[in-house]
């Protein structure tokens, strides 16, 4: 890793500029800058942290992002991003854990480095569980079994990792016995996560579906509904948010877009962000959009670590993120 021979005074100024509250200007968050930040031991001032936390606790449209663990620098050599590079003004980061086995070094880095760092900035760290099949195919298929399964999730991700909540990804409309099991599993989870738990831990329902029978039966148990609106129009957002309106407040509703994933074209390609980055595209439309029945909860992104200066809409090069789009959207939603 290359480092520059800066004086201590210059190093100090770079670090302070990098970590002050809600940075919204464009920055090239290079590997060198991260090395300087970690080696210096300099932290954000108590005043700046206080202001940042106050912003996070205020009534505002939140920004959330799914972070792909297999592209983190702690996961494998050759990767560039670090969760410490995420914008300070990001409200919530979703740990998306594919291709990262339990023995990978990422998990210890998450627990001992990333989570404390992000918590100091008021950023919530949420684990993505995927669907609920693990509850319905393993262990006891009864209330005792579901309760044990849910407690195990809480003990691991809250007790061991000190995370702030969970995300379930439901991309189907379960029926019959599967519906019954999914509802029971969700009720078990809601004793530890969500507005009915009393724990303060967040429960996110992430979906690409209109309200299903499963959702209708479990709606009061979630803090947020994240709609995977990749490739859609704002007209569609208005329609779908109207379908959810009888069951949740619009402040709980967040539409989401996707950054371009490397090697995604043409099969996994949404064109939600225009490249080279120029401040336009579907993601910006989502930030400006509002439901017909109230203000939205915010916007989320998938593959947030791909918020980088790509040269084209199908640039497959792994590049260091600059988070320009994320910071632009935060500013649009909360001017």
Curated annotation (Swiss-Prot):
Q: Which ranges carry the GH18 domain? A: 61-321
Q: Which residues are glycosylated?
A: 73, 89, 143
Keywords, comma-separated and alphabetical: Glycoprotein, Glycosidase, Hydrolase, Secreted, Signal
List locations, semicolon-separated.
Secreted
Task: Write down the EC number.
Answer: 3.2.1.96
Question: Entry's InterPro entries?
Answer: EndoS_F2-like_TIM-barrel, Glyco_hydro18_cat, Glyco_hydro_18_chit_AS, Glycoside_hydrolase_SF
Sorted alphabetically, the Gene Ontology cellular component annotations on this record are: extracellular region
Question: What is any Pfam family matched here?
Answer: TIM-barrel_EndoS
Query: What PROSITE patterns does the entry give?
Result: GH18_1, GH18_2
Q: Which GO terms describe its molecular function?
A: mannosyl-glycoprotein endo-beta-N-acetylglucosaminidase activity
Signal peptide (residue range):
1-45
- Modifications after synthesis and translation: Carbohydrates at Ser-73, Ser-89 and Ser-143 consist of (2-OMe)Man1-4GlcNAcU1-4GlcU1-4Glc1-4(2-OMe)GlcU1-4[(2-OMe)Rham1-2]Man.
Q: Which SUPFAM superfamilies does the entry mention?
A: (Trans)glycosidases
Entry superkingdom: Bacteria
The top EC class is hydrolase
Q: Name one GO biological process term.
A: carbohydrate metabolic process
The residues responsible for catalysis, as annotated, are 171 (proton donor)
Listed under catalytic activity are: an N(4)-(oligosaccharide-(1->3)-[oligosaccharide-(1->6)]-beta-D-Man-(1->4)-beta-D-GlcNAc-(1->4)-alpha-D-GlcNAc)-L-asparaginyl-[protein] + H2O = an oligosaccharide-(1->3)-[oligosaccharide-(1->6)]-beta-D-Man-(1->4)-D-GlcNAc + N(4)-(N-acetyl-beta-D-glucosaminyl)-L-asparaginyl-[protein]
Quaternary structure note = Monomer.
What function is annotated for this protein?
Endohydrolysis of the di-N-acetylchitobiosyl unit in high-mannose glycopeptides and glycoproteins. Complex biantennary glycans are the preferred substrates. Tri- and tetraantennary glycans are not hydrolyzed, and high mannose glycans are very poor substrates.
Q: What's the family?
A: Belongs to the glycosyl hydrolase 18 family.
Q: Per its record, how is this protein called by name?
A: Endo-beta-N-acetylglucosaminidase F2
**What gene is this protein translated from?**
endOF2
